[in-house]
Amino acid sequence: MKKEHVLHCQFSAWYPLFRSLTIKSVILPLPQNVKDYLLDDGTLVVSGREDPPAHSQPDSDDEAEEIQWSDDENTATLTAPEFPEFTTKVQEAINSLGGSVFPKLNWSAPRDAYWIAMNSSLKCKTLSDIFLLFKSSDFITRDFTQPFIHCTDDSPDPCMEYELVLRKWCELIPGAEFRCFVKENKLIGISQRDYTQYYDHISKQKEEICRCIQDFFKKHIQYKFLDEDFVFDIYRDSRGKVWLIDFNPFGEVTDSLLFTWDELLSGTNLKGDFSEEALEQDAPAFRCTNSEVTVQPSPYLSYRLPKDFVDLSTGEDAHKLIDFLKLKRNQQEDD
């Protein structure tokens, strides 16, 4: 896997080519000061609220104390930075997409941080919702700090222009998502995306699902992407229509789900579990969770306790506790 392969999987690189096949989205350049704020792990205060304060002066001593904290050594004002111009652009984009969006950066979405949202979802209605998820996500941090991890070429890292991607919110059923692996422009493997759960309809319809995905690949994807080795995710709705969700590099940086990268790179053990007729047609390997016995824990569970929250639970950082309680109150007011 080379750095150019990673660059080709940026959302803004492929979206113009496949716009008609995927969910409506808006791409906004990410200002440097917003990037700096997202990478700053020194505060849990979340910026991006759309409603300005009703007054500039506190009405009471209690309110003043709520805003400013001091000790014998120094005085610190716990206020979040504001980005009025960017906030306006984001809110306009959210409104144009129906009022709710699924956010991501150039490559990754903050799937590991869904638990921190008040609705335990990646559904966002404001910039503050997005900031909360992004600042809590290791996936987002990796996009910023290690976008070319596992790349084999030694060339200098390209200068990155980061983007906020807002996708129209759609209620997607996890059991209808699949990851597809393409090598030398040939579809070699399909995996159930949510492999931690057993879905009876997948086991019963796997040949039909595989055939449907193959048809979609041959008609819309094959020889049209910028590389010949890549991974793409799709969603198959209740009518059998296939939607393109994302592209990912063909390499270890991408989760191989029910395959191993040794299998995918070498091509061994990739015979599909289908009828002889399907095998004769060179069907890709199709893997799904075959019974409830093989159900596994969610891979995102390990991300659920960041150090900030350990500090909260032990009472070791009073400022972070104050920040979190303010954030919760503000979000309730927004609702």
Swiss-Prot record:
PTM annotation: Phosphorylated.
Localization of this protein: Cytoplasm
Signal peptide: none
Residues that bear Phosphoserine: 60
The keyword RNA-binding belongs to this UniProt entry's keyword annotation: no
GO cellular component: a single term: cytoplasm
GO biological process, one term: eukaryotic translation initiation factor 2 complex assembly
Keywords: ATP-binding, Chaperone, Cytoplasm, Magnesium, Metal-binding, Nucleotide-binding, Phosphoprotein
Chaperone among keywords: yes
Residues the entry annotates as binding ATP: 104, 107, 109, 111, 167-170, 177, 179, 193, 233, 246, 248
Residues that coordinate or bind Mg(2+): 246, 248
Record-linked InterPro entries: CDC123
A GO MF label: ATP binding
Top-rank lineage group of the source organism: Eukaryota
Family assignment from sequence similarity: Belongs to the CDC123 family.
Role, per record: ATP-dependent protein-folding chaperone for the eIF2 complex. Binds to the gamma subunit of the eIF2 complex which allows the subunit to assemble with the alpha and beta subunits.
PANTHER family reported in the protein's UniProt record: CELL DIVISION CYCLE PROTEIN 123 HOMOLOG, D123 PROTEIN
Subunit-level organization: Interacts with the eIF2 complex gamma subunit EIF2S3 (via C-terminus); the interaction is direct. Interacts with the eIF2 complex alpha subunit EIF2S1. Interacts with the eIF2 complex beta subunit EIF2S2.
Protein name in UniProt: Translation initiation factor eIF2 assembly protein
The organism's taxonomic lineage, starting at the top: Eukaryota, Metazoa, Chordata, Craniata, Vertebrata
